[in-house]
Amino acid sequence: MKTAIFTVVLALAVFAVLSFGWEANEKALSEEFTELIHEKEAASETEARECRYFWGECHDHMPCCDWLVCRYKWPITYNICVWSRTFPEK
């Protein structure tokens, strides 16, 4: 009887250690994935856009992209980039 209880307790201890190892590995993988996402995001931000996106706020110092035009749209109190009915050339 003592041997069976000892075996069960030992098995539970082994499962606890393995579970802790898997959680640590999963957490490290999650952190690595998050770091990769932030790295990709930072890389895309470094590619400076010289124009504003669709429905983005525009001014003289913030022009719209080639296929967009800056228009005043009521009731919005600022100018936004809207489609100029043209397509960008590649």
UniProtKB/Swiss-Prot annotation:
Family: Belongs to the neurotoxin 10 (Hwtx-1) family. 13 (Hntx-13) subfamily.
Classification via InterPro entries: Huwentoxin-1
Signal peptide interval: 1-19
Known tissue expression: Expressed by the venom gland.
GO cellular component, one term: extracellular region
Key words of the record: Disulfide bond, Ion channel impairing toxin, Knottin, Secreted, Signal, Toxin
Role according to the record: Ion channel inhibitor.
GO MF, any single term: ion channel inhibitor activity
Protein's name in the database: U7-theraphotoxin-Hhn1c
UniProt lineage: Eukaryota, Metazoa, Ecdysozoa, Arthropoda, Chelicerata
Cleaved propeptide residues: 20-50
Chief location of this protein within or outside the cell: secreted
Written domain comment of the UniProt record: The presence of a 'disulfide through disulfide knot' structurally defines this protein as a knottin.
